[in-house]
Amino acid sequence: IGAATEDTHEGMATLEKTADDLRASEFVPFKAGMDAGAHLVMVGHVSAPNLTGDNTPCSLSAEVITNLLRGELGYNGIVITDAMDMSAITEYYDSGEAAVMALKAGADMILMPEDFEAAYEGVLTAVRDGVISEEQINESLRRIYRVKYRDRIDQDGNVVDNISGQQAPVEGEGQEGTAGEGQEGTVAEG
């Protein structure tokens, strides 16, 4: 976000603007992108205490991801964190803790945790213990699959080669799955 003067690669960055000021300035291009059909929004590690009520990075904040992006702005696409190996995260959280916090906050994807195995184990344990529900993971997967397949299905429900735009050959029967929200047909998965 433009008003942050610090670099989250190097440490914590804080926005001191009020929530109303952020809505009137920094959020305008994000809202325009969402309205234009952006498939993915990356949430950075900047802290916005006047928006969230504390110094939690936006990428780990349910106030930002769930309440603002998904609730107030009505965004239902993929939310991905900025790289989790940045100092704004690694100086304050271990990889497992940060990954769990991001998913609990509403992120669908965790980008580049400092320690992938620790992040994976943290999430796995959180799901096993009921800290993160399987339904939440499944909803994130639905968002990801919807985007993944959206650009691969033509209006007739045929799988299309992403590079040429031509119908892709499908060998064998494969497995059938739904094409995606608002589209009819099946896709071959393999």
Segments predicted by a language model, with ranges:
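Flexible, glycine/charged-enriched surface loops at secondary-structure junctions
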Residues: I132-N138, I153-V159
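Second-shell residues forming the walls of enzyme active-site clefts
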Residues: I1-Q136, R143
